[in-house]
């Protein structure tokens, strides 16, 4: 039987289908503005995988709790909370997505581990040798920085970001792109080097929509791993564990 997972983010819903017989499937969708009916949700899911049947339970992690109301109440759901993540030393306001993705990185690579989620905001998340949350940082992501420049400065053009862009921009677009992308990469390098001074030769996970892009700028650092769907893998791992041990 297929297993459905859903990560509800600030602007997009991230879906995954896991099963024993085939590789996982992943896709994103813009956050809906209207509630799903039961039949609409079934149609939406079966367009991705015809094998999905109505009432297939969905394991959910949401950083936007109000969007949970957009799902039909009578569709089976397991809504994860921070207390469901076996990661100790978490402060109460720690984002559920951060905790799950860090836990999954630790499950995949062992502890200690560093996980960097490059989404709307970029979060840097450290786990120590005992599997505890060991602190982190939050900074504006690529899109958020570009949006801030556009809103705060008149007549700036739209900009496309590329890891192959020249550091020394020869026009406004390339100068903005360089400032944003290399500025973020420089900040991340500082955190990584500090963490590695305490935990040499331990892996660094990059995830999120801009994870691969930013990781390309740090390829000189050892053991950088890109896992775009780390959060969805973590949701599935936790949901399976909860089914095995519901207490």
Curated annotation (Swiss-Prot):
Q: A biological process (GO) annotation for this entry?
A: coenzyme A biosynthetic process
What Pfam families would the database entry show?
Pan_kinase
Binding-site list for ATP: 7-14, 120
List the GO terms this entry assigns under cellular component, sorted alphabetically: cytoplasm
Give binding positions for K(+).
117
Its subcellular locations are:
Cytoplasm
Q: In which pathway does it act?
A: Cofactor biosynthesis; coenzyme A biosynthesis; CoA from (R)-pantothenate: step 1/5
Cite the EC number. Answer: 2.7.1.33
Cofactor note from UniProt?
A monovalent cation. Ammonium or potassium.
Q: Which cofactor does it need?
A: NH4(+); K(+)
Principal place of residence: cytoplasm
Which InterPro entries does this UniProt record tie to the protein?
Answer: ATPase_NBD, Type_III_PanK
Binding positions for substrate per the UniProt entry: 91, 95-98, 172
What CDD domains would the database entry show? ASKHA_NBD_PanK-III
> What UniProt keywords are attached to this protein's entry?
ATP-binding, Coenzyme A biosynthesis, Cytoplasm, Kinase, Metal-binding, Nucleotide-binding, Potassium, Transferase
Q: What does this protein do?
A: Catalyzes the phosphorylation of pantothenate (Pan), the first step in CoA biosynthesis.
Q: How does it assemble?
A: Homodimer.
> What family is this protein classified in?
Belongs to the type III pantothenate kinase family.
Q: What is this protein called?
A: Type III pantothenate kinase
Q: Which organism is it from?
A: Synechococcus elongatus (strain ATCC 33912 / PCC 7942 / FACHB-805)
Taxonomic lineage of the native organism? Bacteria, Bacillati, Cyanobacteriota, Cyanophyceae, Synechococcales
* Name of encoding gene: coaX
């Amino acid at each position: 039987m297929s297993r459905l997972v859903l990560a509800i983010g600030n602007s997009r819903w991230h879906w995954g289908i896991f099963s024993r017989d085939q590789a996982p499937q992943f896709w994103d969708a813009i956050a809906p503005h209207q509630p799903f009916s039961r039949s609409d949700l079934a149609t939406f899911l079966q367009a991705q995988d015809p094998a999905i049947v109505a009432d297939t339970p969905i394991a959910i992690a949401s950083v936007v709790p109000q969007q949970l109301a957009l799902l039909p109440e009578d569709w089976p759901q397991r809504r994860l909370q921070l207390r469901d993540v076996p990661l100790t030393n978490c402060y109460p306001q720690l984002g559920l997505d951060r905790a799950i993705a860090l836990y999954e990185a630790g499950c995949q690579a062992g502890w200690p581990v560093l996980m960097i989620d490059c989404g709307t905001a970029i979060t840097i998340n450290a786990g120590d040798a005992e599997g505890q949350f060991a602190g982190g940082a939050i900074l504006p992501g690529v899109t958020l920085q570009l949006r801030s420049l556009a809103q705060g400065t008149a007549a700036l053009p739209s900009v496309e970001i590329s890891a192959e862009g020249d550091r020394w921009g020869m026009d406004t677009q390339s100068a903005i792109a360089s400032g944003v992308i290399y500025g973020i990469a420089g900040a991340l390098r500082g955190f990584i080097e500090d963490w590695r001074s305490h935990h040499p030769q331990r892996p660094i996970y990059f995830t999120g929509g801009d994870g691969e892009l930013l990781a390309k700028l740090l390829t000189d650092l050892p053991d950088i791993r890109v896992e775009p769907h780390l959060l969805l893998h973590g949701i599935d791992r936790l949901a399976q564990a909860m089914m095995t041990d519901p207490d």
